[in-house]
Structures are given as C-alpha cells and as structure tokens.
Amino acid sequence: MLSTEMKLTLGLVTAFVSISIPAGAAPKDWPQWRGPNRDGLSAEKGLLKQWPSDGPPLAWRVKGPGRGMSSVATANGVVYTVGVRNKGSGGVWVTAFSPKNGEELWSAFAFNGSDVNGAPTVDGNRLYLVGIAGELVCLDATTGAPVWKKSYHSDFPGSPKPGWGFSEAPLVDGDRLICIPGAPDAGIVALNKATGAVIWKTAVPHQGGGHAGAGYTGVVISQGAGVKQYVTLMGHGLVGVRASDGQFLWGYKRVANGTASIPTPIVRGDHVFASSGYGTGAALLKLEKAGDGVKATEVYFLPGNTVQNHHGGMVLIGDHVYLGSGHNNGLPTCVEFLTGKVAWGPERGPGTKSAAIVAADGHLYFRFEDGIMGLIEASPKGYNLKGSFKLASVSGPSWPHPVVSDGRLYIRDQDNLLCYDVRAK
C-alpha cells in the first residue's frame, strides 16, 4: 500500500480473542480493512474450489474510483472505495457502487489530497477514512455527507508523516474510534466515534527499531494475558496499549525496520505474530500478566532469509500462518504458528513480486503485483495451486488487497474496480 519504489475466522477464534465487528455488519460483509475481524478471513462458503483456465467469470468492471491504493469495504448492500478523482476541484473522493452491477450510487468529496492508501471503515451509517497527510474524516455512509473531521497535523502536533503517508484504516471498537497519529504524546488515540472528541491519547515510547511515529497498518484487538489491548506495528516496533485508558503495556522492536513496517499483526489467545520486509523477518510473542501490566516474551524469531512479509498481509488458519514471503516477493509460504517451523514454501507461485492475500472457504486468494490472481489450497500438507488468471485490468503494481464478500471477489486497480463471481454453481 505505498508509492513508486513500493507504494505501498476461517480458522479458530478462541475465547481469548476479542472481536470488534462494525455495527450493522452482516456475515457476508467486509466492512473494514482485512475483513470483519481484521484477520483477512472471510466466513464465505460455497465458493469455487477450482478456477477455470481463464479464471472465474468477470461479473462487471467499472471506471471511476480514482487513483490510489485503497482497497474496498462492503456493507449496507454497497461497495465503498476511495481514490483521487479529477472531478470538481479534484482531491480524494469516496464512491459507493452497487454490488450487483457496479452502478455508481453516489460519490462524495472527502478532503484535498494527491494520493490515498488506507481503506475505508464502515460502521452502520458512518464511514471513517484516514488520508496520507493525516486527514481523518467521518462521513455519512448512505450519502457521503460530512459528519466531522480532524487532522493529525493540527490536532495531534508532532505526528511525523511516514515516508509514503499515513496508510491506516481506523478501528471502530464500541463507541470508540482508534487511530494512530504517532505523535510524541498521542502515539495512539481513542476518539468518540460520533463526535471525534478525544477520549484518551497515549505516548508510546520509541522501541528502538525502525523510525518514529506510525507504521503502515492499523490496530487489532487482543485479550492477551487477560487484558483487553490494542496492538499495532508502529514505525519503531510492535506495541500494545490497554484499551480502557491507553496505558502503554509492552513493546518489541525486532520486527520493525527503518523503511516501512507494513503487515497487520495476527493475534490469537496470548500470542501475537508479526512480520515485516526489508530483510527483517517474523516473530511470535507471548503476552503474560506482570503486576498491573503485561509483558511480551519472544517465543521465536525467524530471520528474513527464512520468512518475511513485505506487504500484502498474512492469515492464520487452524495452526498455520499463510503468507507471501520475501522482500518485494510474495512467495507462497506456510509456517506453524506456535513453533515457527516452515511447513512448506517458499514456492514460486503463478505470479511475481509482492502478493496480497485473503482467505475464504479453505482457500487462499493471492493477488500478485504483476496482476496475476492465484487460488491456493489452505493446507499445511503442501502447496496446491487450484487455478490462476490475469486480471482484466492491470494499471501498475497490484497492491490493493482483494476482498471476498457475498460470493464476489473485488479487485481495485487504480481507476478500475473489478468484480468476479466466485460462487460454486
């Protein structure tokens, strides 16, 4: 999800993992970044288990989302995405499309900007979006009308803009909106989702790795060590803060790098799995109670020449993590979650360079940077490609993450939005 050099559960959900699904979301919806639970997993069933040689049917293709690396969200019977449009005074626009035929339902100006990376978060009748310069807006999800707005730059002074811009998708948790300005006294903030008022803000100590401020991902929720906490990979390390008041709990620097820490961490029970590229690697941490706080202990660390996820995400299905491994590579790889043992991979795969992945109905949907889609069986027994095809539109690096919702595979490609029918007939 970045720019030129890089522009950047199906499985078990244990009783220890706290899930925050946006209000009004139906099981078929994908209302936010990485899906209902921010884990890249769709609950869809009845999907194709093998693709035809030319791929699943293209249901529709439309122009109009605008430029950018934003993925899509589905909710309220609508497909939402965000882009820079040459419309009116230009700038960043949110556009709503019909999932049935791609008809544009409405579009609304969000803010001035030259690019956009983050996906929208839809919560009932509200939509939230962060721009690359730290613009934060809340819009009416039925019309696009503005509700409230903030600016990381002016409301949280000292927020250092990441090299390719802010790229998070804010998290809705109950009545709160959780964001990552990365400022010295507001590394992570909780806002009233209805008004934008600050509930708490917390200083996050620099962990000694990477760079100051935000990374390129959002927040996930963990109940590790019996404490509800917000976990994210910031520019300088992996961190956890207490959800109730923002109290800093723990940090870990080895998975941060000096350029861009991007993948969304995976949480399950008392464990957190994280990875980043640029030769960095991957790690599993165990969270344990320590007095009134929480301590994070490294279970294992895998060097970058074994496993590293540049960007494109990772999914945990059963006891295994599936990802595209390698810097500027998306080589399909399977790793045992609790041990770090590589079950299989890295495999060459049908496409080249980085890959964005999600999972549905026992299969991995790999979108490679060169515009090739691959369907791979999600099994630790071995690599099994079940079909691949070239996307109908390839306008540059194919970095926006795929979305599987209501039997449809959505692909954003700059000013194109593609919808494939992946239902089994």
Which residues fall in each region the model found?
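Bacterial N-terminal signal peptides that target proteins for export
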Residues: 1-11
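Noncatalytic, solvent-exposed loop/strand surfaces
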Residues: 23-425
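Bacterial N-terminal signal peptides
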Residues: 9-20
